[in-house]
Amino acid sequence: MLILTRRVGETLMVGDDVTVTVLGVKGNQVRIGVNAPKEVAVHREEIYQRIQREKSAQAGESDHQDD
């Protein structure tokens, strides 16, 4: 894992098309802004995991529909 230190207002680049900017720090919360092309999905981890679970459940349902 790459660990970087950034201050409020500073940005890091992910590849050529994605920027992540530190917008603010309040207590133990950090607000970040992400600029990415439309074709790049950006989700909080818990939302991403929920999407993956739903996809798996749907795939399981479609497997059973063929029976």
Swiss-Prot record:
GO terms for biological process: mRNA catabolic process; negative regulation of translational initiation; positive regulation of translational initiation; regulation of carbohydrate metabolic process. The gene is csrA. InterPro entries: CsrA, CsrA_sf. Keywords: Activator, Cytoplasm, Repressor, RNA-binding, Translation regulation. Homodimer; the beta-strands of each monomer intercalate to form a hydrophobic core, while the alpha-helices form wings that extend away from the core. Pfam families: CsrA. It is found in: Cytoplasm. This is Translational regulator CsrA. A key translational regulator that binds mRNA to regulate translation initiation and/or mRNA stability. Mediates global changes in gene expression, shifting from rapid growth to stress survival by linking envelope stress, the stringent response and the catabolite repression systems. Usually binds in the 5'-UTR; binding at or near the Shine-Dalgarno sequence prevents ribosome-binding, repressing translation, binding elsewhere in the 5'-UTR can activate translation and/or stabilize the mRNA. Its function is antagonized by small RNA(s). One of its GO terms (molecular function) is mRNA 5'-UTR binding. Belongs to the CsrA/RsmA family. It comes from Hahella chejuensis (strain KCTC 2396).
